[in-house]
Amino acid sequence: MNQFPWLSIIILFPLFAAFFIPLLPSRENQTVRWYTLGICLLDFLVMSYIFGYYYDFHNSSFQFKESIEWIPTIGFKWALGVDGLSMGLILLTGLVTTLAVLAAWPITCNPKLFYFLMLVMYSGQIGLFTSQDLFLFFLMWELELIPIYLLISLWGGRRRLYAATKFIFYTAIGSLFLFIATFTVCFYGANIATWHFEDLAEKEYPFILEKILYLGFGFAYAVKLPIIPFHTWLPDTHGEAHYSTCMLLAGILLKMGGYGWIRINMTLFPNAHAYFAPWLVILGTVQIIYAASVCLSQKNLKRRIAYSSISHMGFVLIGICSFTNIGLSGAICQMISHGLIGASLFFLAGTTYDRIRTVSLSEMGGIALKMPKMFSMFTGFSLASLALPTMSGFVAEMMIFLGIISSTFYSPSFRCFIILFQALGVILTPIYLLSMLRQMFYGVDTFHFESMSFIDSGPREVFIIVSLFIPVIIIGLYPNILLSIWQNALSIL
């Protein structure tokens, strides 16, 4: 069954389907909505089926391999494969994108272009997580750039052009470094370019060149993850983008940076990774505390959630640099956990804005009684974000803590220092999240409910939140269901 081109199908199906959107009837938005939702759902069900029935979880190597000559003169191939590391992120992409399409139901301004861009992004994201060729990885990385820019600039808030320009400026610079590093790696020491990950892993470089290449790739990932000081595009982008776009940004786009760091930097440049790891651990710790502290001063609901995402990504960086399987496993778990939680919080923030027409926390208050379902869902995911036991965030952060504690790569004093400041970041998290809940749902009746018509969450919104909340609880209660996916794959990294 592995000989069947399953991966090509789940990558190209949404892309080809996107080009049929202009042919759909223009009078009714319902047609393009259901068409796009059906495409995403079918693709998600197909990937779930093939991974559930045909993936060998005891095999640590890549499966469903495909390799087709594309540009023979430079050795470029359409090379795909899936292992435990990429499978979880592919399934996350399918789930979040499908629900983001459903979340975009209220979009009425040029819906054909909106859903076209979402399907193009969907293909690019799956393509990136399945790429086994470095040039193909680069192409899929770049495929995200224009759709995200258009989604922000055309369907965003009042400062959407500023946010979109800032986003493309940061990511374009990161892409330039990625482009230079990619071609340097592939052409170094060979007359014919070597693009396949397995072949590149066998190359050796002078230490100074390895460090330069590590930083070149790392800069691109640092923008996407993001890592301070390359993070300032994120609050502006989340603050202005439509909440369905925010779901894709928080749920999937940020994870591309973490995935690239593990798949390329750790694997291809192990000596440079060991050299920079202590500094990255310190940077990740500073990021946790800094972003959590800035959260407390944010009066804009979406910007507060954006800074909380930056803080949580600091844990991912620490786990990647822990040099332990449990720490690295925790980093991957944190990426998936945050993908679910972050997407949910931005969706809830957006649907709240649809009702009260403000994201200013100082203008909110006392809406719990009129919107009890919204209040319950916001509370549940806020508790998940602060890593409450029985939820996925707790499992991920605990594994990262254990990974850095048990790491023999670092001295005991360094580990104690990092754990101490990580704990401080963990303490700050409930402060800004519970404060957010208090400002939104408790306190004075700001909106004079007797003269306003409030509508609580409807079936569509409840379905989206429940679909994201169920895996958060399952991972929190039975983490081995998720961890077993990549356990064997991590043993060979």
Swiss-Prot record:
Disulfide bonds: none annotated. It is a multi-pass membrane protein. It catalyses: a plastoquinone + NADH + (n+1) H(+)(in) = a plastoquinol + NAD(+) + n H(+)(out); a plastoquinone + NADPH + (n+1) H(+)(in) = a plastoquinol + NADP(+) + n H(+)(out). Its main location: plastid. GO terms for molecular function: NADH dehydrogenase (ubiquinone) activity; ubiquinone binding. Pfam families: Proton_antipo_M (PF00361). Its EC number is 7.1.1.-. Keywords: Chloroplast, Membrane, NAD, NADP, Plastid, Plastoquinone, Quinone, Thylakoid, Translocase, Transmembrane, Transmembrane helix. GO terms for biological process: ATP synthesis coupled electron transport; electron transport coupled proton transport. It is found in: Plastid, Chloroplast thylakoid membrane. The chain crosses the membrane at residues 4-24, 34-54, 87-107, 111-131, 134-154, 167-187, 212-232, 242-262, 276-296, 313-333, 334-354, 385-405, 417-437, 462-482. The keyword Transferase does not apply. One of its GO terms (cellular component) is chloroplast thylakoid membrane. Belongs to the complex I subunit 4 family. HAMAP family: NDH1_NuoM (MF_00491). This is NAD(P)H-quinone oxidoreductase chain 4, chloroplastic. It comes from Chara vulgaris.
